[in-house]
Amino acid sequence: MYKRQEQSRACEGWDKIDVPSVWQLRGYDKMHYTDVLYPFPVNPPYVPDENPTGIYKKTVVLDEQWMEKDTVLKFHGVDSAFDVWVNGNHVGFGKVSRLPSEFDITGFVKTGENDITVRVYKWSDGTYLEDQDMWWLSGIYRDVELINEEKNAVLDLRVNGTLDDSYKNGLFTAGI
């Protein structure tokens, strides 16, 4: 873990950390609880220059059969914000700490070894929206999945319903 983002470029001598887990429970940062005060000077949308940053690296091996389908990288929870690279290519950025984030990495993976790198930032401009009576715990704190799904799969289905004035008849519309 690093105090500043620019310090996090070299990877020699890295420690291992379990995923899912949080830095503070692994001794990489202080436990911090807030109820009404922000844990840093309030100056939206800016965050402190000293913004603890953690880098995660994982190598996965994919076979030719895997490559016949689409590949999605899903994070079930990362706090606070994060960048993702696959084989050196930036594939996305996320900053919704309490919800899953998915990245279609089909065009970035290959048969054989694939390097996945994630840079997690303790603070982001989204931190201003998330501050509440809570412990601040940073890192990849929920599961991560590499999903192999059929090409052109339906990933999102929307159904809307309305009722007529009698509340007896309805009309449903669906979309993907």
Give the ranges of each region predicted by the language model.
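Surface beta-strand/loop "capping" patches
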Residues: 151-176
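Short, low-complexity, polar/charged sequence segments that are solvent-exposed and flexible
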Residues: 10-12, 33-36, 92, 135-139, ...
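N-terminal glycine-rich cofactor-binding segment
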Residues: 36-45
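Beta-propeller folds
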Residues: 7, 17, 61, 65, ...
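Accessory beta-strand-rich segments of carbohydrate-active enzymes
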Residues: 3, 22, 26, 30, ...
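Alpha-helix boundary/capping detector
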Residues: 40-41, 142, 170
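Intrinsically disordered, low-complexity regulatory regions of eukaryotic regulatory proteins
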Residues: 10-16, 27, 33, 154
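Hydrophobic alpha-helical membrane-insertion signals
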Residues: 3-23
